[in-house]
Amino acid sequence: MARIAGIDLPKNKRIEIALTYIYGIGRTTAKNILVATSIDGSTRTDKLTEAEIGKLREEIDKNVKVEGDLRREVSMNIKRLMDLGCYRGLRHRKGLPCRGQRTKTNARTRKGPARTVAGKKK
């Protein structure tokens, strides 16, 4: 089983798809990595040689930010926005959508489960 960037890649999948199991690598990035390392994308993960796995590891370490580093960078970007006190930072701080979606209805994913408010007495 190939282990790249701390992730065990699935054996029975094509390497082009298996690389997408690594956080930070999508289909396009996976194709670019395979072109750079001159490995055929239709090769199954278990058919890769140690040399090819080494080339993949080296290419990913050198040119792509993945897993922990990428997660850390994203969280630092969000923290920076919150420290600045800009609109997006305030929305992150309040746990609301920050890309202009409506919040009167919907937005339940960001706001969490609905808190019921007592109705008005007649």
UniProtKB/Swiss-Prot annotation:
Cellular component annotations (GO), alphabetically ordered: cytosol; small ribosomal subunit
GO molecular function: rRNA binding; structural constituent of ribosome; tRNA binding
Pfam families, alphabetized: Ribosomal_S13
GO biological process: translation
Annotated segments matching region Disordered: 97-122
Superkingdom of the organism of origin: Bacteria
UniProt entry keywords in alphabetical sequence: Ribonucleoprotein, Ribosomal protein, RNA-binding, rRNA-binding, tRNA-binding
Family, similarity comment: Belongs to the universal ribosomal protein uS13 family.
HAMAP family attached to this UniProt entry: Ribosomal_uS13
Subunit and partners: Part of the 30S ribosomal subunit. Forms a loose heterodimer with protein S19. Forms two bridges to the 50S subunit in the 70S ribosome.
Function noted in UniProt: Located at the top of the head of the 30S subunit, it contacts several helices of the 16S rRNA. In the 70S ribosome it contacts the 23S rRNA (bridge B1a) and protein L5 of the 50S subunit (bridge B1b), connecting the 2 subunits; these bridges are implicated in subunit movement. Contacts the tRNAs in the A and P-sites.
Protein name per UniProt: Small ribosomal subunit protein uS13
Organism: Trichlorobacter lovleyi (strain ATCC BAA-1151 / DSM 17278 / SZ) (Geobacter lovleyi)
Species lineage: Bacteria, Pseudomonadati, Thermodesulfobacteriota, Desulfuromonadia, Geobacterales
